[in-house]
């Protein structure tokens, strides 16, 4: 299938929405930074302009594929006439030694796209592979990432989390309120922060924006519960309580105290060794920055057939 047709089809996993972010713009920037103002001088100087080739993508490690659809967008941006065949799609498991894509067309075009395709795909597949491991261990809790992403690539990183079986936390500072320790300290306490936030959202017509409140101690958990139960305090936008760096026992106690009033989210000290036990506490979500800030790229190579 022509890359242009692949790129225009609906992806198996749509990227998270963002009001000012364009995947096409990110792809164009990645391609432009690679070729600069004179182009791919290696290919231009060694390969005749009309040379046609076939190349394949080879998995050199086992993991979860992510970046299949984005790679088609990259290839189409370089040369819409390239023909691509995908044997695996986003979210599929790929095995070490497996060829999972074939692209045919102008050799210069393939090589111009090569590094950008691999950079996106290796990082995304690394994130998806790690997310899959965490998500499987965390069940029945749902894994979330954080905003600890590569600047300029947040939607790409969060897209990979979706492909790996996780869910997205807030995309940025604009789509969810998180009242954390610094906000609480500056506002003069949890109650002041929540009331001020509810007032702000009401005055600006931001009824779709929800509030998450961080609690670091059981006393703070009880303070939030008291607010939720107080008929004189507006808390309709508060939908989640973050349990920050709490022990397993404290998380179990907090979940029991919350008793379904709002969702709960465990955060802090989340590793592949601890995430299963955290998931058994009854929390709704588990968030980990490691899914995007400590990931290892999945080893994938592109090879021209000879």
Regions of interest found by a model, annotated:
Residues 2-227, 249-257, 263-266, 272, ...:
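Acidic/glycine-rich phosphate/pyrophosphate-binding loops and surrounding catalytic core
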Residues 229-237:
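Intrinsically disordered, low-complexity Ser/Thr- and acidic-rich flexible linkers and loops
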Residues 231, 283-284, 304-305:
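Short, hinge-like loop/turn segments at secondary-structure boundaries
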Residues 243, 262-263:
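A generic structural signal for short
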Residues 246:
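Glycine/alanine-rich phosphate-binding loops at beta-alpha junctions
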Residues 290-306:
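Short, charged, intrinsically disordered terminal tails
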